[in-house]
């Protein structure tokens, strides 16, 4: 019951009794805007030829936290039937953009609300395989509500994505869980935490250090010393860092890890390359983590 309530409040449905069949009535594709390209990739693959998807954040150099929407972004949202925002305080500019461009037949999916993460929680929801599965379910359900005439098509798209598109992603997660569960790791910021939790890896780096780097503030001296000592004394087996947010403190830890012979794996905030699919991007990173763990635990 709780999951149903969360799903219901996460998507703001369109008002008006006839809006659910609006897309099929015009025999037009559903116009979708995703705040970030990782959600946009999933939305595009679930919708196939029945949707058009525009991702606002699609450059590796853009910072979703403080992005300034353009006139083109506003125009895209103005005509969108469906908007996907991360929520949880990650992209507050989306709500402002939607409010400034009202449309009675538009639905908005707030991923944070869907999975129960409020502002102040860890907003890196796309790094949680569990949350990703919930998003897939919700987007597919929303497509069928917006365009019920194509429900069978959307069901098939979802099945293909889950059984084929995500097959390697799911397998790598299972492999890492079964082989390296409980392994202590170091990390540069909280973007790593949701994935590590699902992989059953133990993040040893102080949580306050991870949060500081993610939020763009300076870690405390005590946290810096702790993170450094964990590497020097090899309390962590590998170190994972976000290469799109490499501060001097993070760079120092990466160098320290390499000097100590601790394998280093890399993740990024958004799709790299920008044209990659969600699953190809994640698979590449998971393979890097798996290789680092293998190297660290091989005598």
Stretches with model-predicted labels:
Residues 4-8:
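C-terminal motif of bacterial Sec signal peptides marking the signal peptidase cleavage site
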């Amino acid at each position: 019951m709780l999951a149903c309530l969360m799903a219901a409040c996460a998507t703001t449905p369109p008002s008006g009794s006839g809006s659910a069949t609006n897309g099929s009535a015009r025999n037009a594709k559903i116009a979708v805007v995703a705040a970030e390209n990782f959600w946009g990739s999933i939305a595009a693959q679930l919708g196939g030829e029945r949707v058009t998807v525009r991702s606002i954040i699609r450059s590796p150099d853009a910072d979703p936290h403080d992005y300034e929407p353009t006139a083109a972004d506003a125009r895209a949202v103005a005509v969108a039937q469906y908007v996907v925002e991360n929520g949880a305080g990650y992209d507050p500019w989306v709500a402002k953009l939607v409010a400034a461009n009202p449309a009675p037949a538009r639905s908005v999916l707030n991923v944070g609300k869907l999975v129960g993460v409020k502002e102040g929680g860890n907003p890196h929801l796309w790094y949680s395989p569990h949350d990703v599965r919930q998003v897939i379910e919700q987007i597919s359900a929303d497509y069928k509500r917006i365009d019920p005439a194509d429900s069978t098509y959307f069901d098939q798209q979802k099945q293909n994505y889950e059984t084929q598109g995500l097959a390697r992603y799911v397998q790598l997660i299972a492999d890492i869980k079964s082989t390296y569960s409980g392994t202590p790791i170091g990390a540069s910021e909280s973007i790593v935490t949701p994935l590590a939790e699902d992989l059953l890896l133990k993040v040893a780096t102080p949580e306050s250090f991870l949060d500081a780097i993610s939020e763009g503030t300076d870690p405390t001296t005590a946290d810096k010393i702790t993170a450094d000592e964990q590497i020097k004394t090899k309390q962590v087996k590998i170190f994972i860092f976000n290469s799109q947010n490499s501060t001097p403190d993070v760079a120092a830890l990466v160098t320290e890890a390499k000097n100590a012979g601790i394998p280093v794996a890399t993740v990024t905030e958004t799709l790299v390359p920008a044209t990659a699919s969600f699953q190809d991007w994640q698979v590449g990173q998971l393979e890097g983590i798996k290789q680092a763990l293998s190297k660290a635990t091989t005598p």
